[in-house]
Amino acid sequence: METDLQVVRVPITHPDAQALIEAVQAEYVARYGGQDESPIDPADFEEPLGRFYVGYLDGTPVATGAWRRSSVRALGAQVTAEVKRMYVVPTAQRRGVARRMLTHLEATAAEAGIEAMVLETGMKQPEAIALYTSSGYEPIAGFGHYRGSELSRCFGRRIA
């Protein structure tokens, strides 16, 4: 389903970004019993290290997505980026918003010279796993903060 999603680059500290990050953290509490505590440095989402985006439908912030350069080597790529903070508010789900955001992240990362995207998602997020696998992501070894976590699944995809 097509959407009229407007994807806007913003700092992670932007009020719309912060409101949506709070919403996804509440979702993590509901699903896992606690917030995502992976280390996040706002500078990781500024050039040249990464980007942060908010998606708007009819002027309303409904989604976030970001990428940051990563030291993870996967799928034969020398230059990778990690997808972070993918989230769509419940009222905008099942409308293609997440797929549009993911496509935007991949395109902007490729423009910045990224060869592959890597990411982590949780076992209690089957809709996220379905999005990533249907978008061509394949399982990779756990990495970083999530290495060894039984609730985490890591994926990667060559984009260049």
Residue spans of the language-model regions?
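C-terminal "cap" of GNAT-fold acetyltransferases
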Residues: E2, V10-H14, A112-V118, G122-A160
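Active-site acidic-Proline motif in GNAT/NAT acetyltransferases
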Residues: V89-T91, R95, M123
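Acetyl-CoA-dependent GNAT
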Residues: E2-K84, V89-T91, L102-H104, T108, ...
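Conserved amphipathic alpha-helical interaction elements at protein-protein interfaces in regulatory
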Residues: R94, A107-E111, E138
